[in-house]
Amino acid sequence: MAQKEEAAAATEAASQNGEDLENLDDPEKLKELIELPPFEIVTGERLPANFFKFQFRNVEYSSGRNKTFLCYVVEAQGKGGQVQASRGYLEDEHAAAHAEEAFFNTILPAFDPALRYNVTWYVSSSPCAACADRIIKTLSKTKNLRLLILVGRLFMWEELEIQDALKKLKEAGCKLRIMKPQDFEYVWQNFVEQEEGESKAFQPWEDIQENFLYYEEKLADILK
């Protein structure tokens, strides 16, 4: 009975995550799906320190980093000059939809035409082609939105589809930058929940500057 319930739960999880339902007779595949939680978008004000240290690290080969972490700052300014500011982070879990799309669905689902929006994202990796397309469409119909995206790594930058998507982002008015060591420190101070007894000072990893320069050069070559 328990196995049937687990199989039913796995079927539902597979459906939500876009898995092939024909493979559920495979015991190993079934075990994998049972262990896979349903898709969800996690939101909050501060992310755990161990998540930041692993997911945001600007390594050249991002093996195992199959989530997107997006920290955001939203500043909405009215005609009188008053600024309403908010910040937080999103994390996608086993998702077909990504954190970039979730931002526009949950954090800023609508834009007040009387306000000017300045939005800054600090993202663990650059957008995929589908997310870039969503961003471009949002920018094209929202003239009072300015978006700056700072990324720790470039996602699959060798692929022509990704390169074209990044170029189109620039053409749409989106500012795209690689995170400098100072940007990682800013995220650490403002978006990370430091562990008890841990130093609140940001401790840069050994190759942080070298990897920043590596990705900065790649992005410049793509966008030139």
From Swiss-Prot:
<dbReference type="GO" id="GO:0003723">
    <property type="term" value="F:RNA binding"/>
</dbReference>
<feature type="binding site">
    <location>
        <position position="128"/>
    </location>
    <ligand>
        <name>Zn(2+)</name>
    </ligand>
</feature>
<dbReference type="GO" id="GO:0006397">
    <property type="term" value="P:mRNA processing"/>
</dbReference>
<comment type="subunit">
    <text>Homotetramer.</text>
</comment>
<feature type="active site" description="Proton donor">
    <location>
        <position position="100"/>
    </location>
</feature>
<feature type="binding site">
    <location>
        <position position="98"/>
    </location>
    <ligand>
        <name>Zn(2+)</name>
    </ligand>
</feature>
<dbReference type="InterPro" id="IPR016193">
    <property type="entry name" value="Cytidine_deaminase-like"/>
</dbReference>
<dbReference type="InterPro" id="IPR050610">
    <property type="entry name" value="APOBEC_Cyt_Deaminase"/>
</dbReference>
<dbReference type="GO" id="GO:0044029">
    <property type="term" value="P:positive regulation of gene expression via chromosomal CpG island demethylation"/>
</dbReference>
<comment type="similarity">
    <text>Belongs to the cytidine and deoxycytidylate deaminase family.</text>
</comment>
<feature type="binding site">
    <location>
        <position position="60"/>
    </location>
    <ligand>
        <name>Zn(2+)</name>
    </ligand>
</feature>
<dbReference type="GO" id="GO:0005737">
    <property type="term" value="C:cytoplasm"/>
</dbReference>
<feature type="region of interest" description="Disordered">
    <location>
        <begin position="1"/>
        <end position="25"/>
    </location>
</feature>
<keyword id="KW-0479">Metal-binding</keyword>
<comment type="function">
    <text>Probable C to U editing enzyme whose physiological substrate is not yet known. Does not display detectable apoB mRNA editing. Has a low intrinsic cytidine deaminase activity. May play a role in the epigenetic regulation of gene expression through the process of active DNA demethylation.</text>
</comment>
<dbReference type="InterPro" id="IPR002125">
    <property type="entry name" value="CMP_dCMP_dom"/>
</dbReference>
<dbReference type="GO" id="GO:0046872">
    <property type="term" value="F:metal ion binding"/>
</dbReference>
<dbReference type="Pfam" id="PF18772">
    <property type="entry name" value="APOBEC2"/>
</dbReference>
<dbReference type="GO" id="GO:0004126">
    <property type="term" value="F:cytidine deaminase activity"/>
</dbReference>
<keyword id="KW-0378">Hydrolase</keyword>
<keyword id="KW-0862">Zinc</keyword>
<dbReference type="GO" id="GO:0005634">
    <property type="term" value="C:nucleus"/>
</dbReference>
<protein>
    <recommendedName>
        <fullName>Probable C-&gt;U-editing enzyme APOBEC-2</fullName>
        <ecNumber>3.5.4.36</ecNumber>
    </recommendedName>
</protein>
<feature type="binding site">
    <location>
        <position position="131"/>
    </location>
    <ligand>
        <name>Zn(2+)</name>
    </ligand>
</feature>
<keyword id="KW-0507">mRNA processing</keyword>
<feature type="domain" description="CMP/dCMP-type deaminase">
    <location>
        <begin position="64"/>
        <end position="169"/>
    </location>
</feature>
<dbReference type="GO" id="GO:0016554">
    <property type="term" value="P:cytidine to uridine editing"/>
</dbReference>
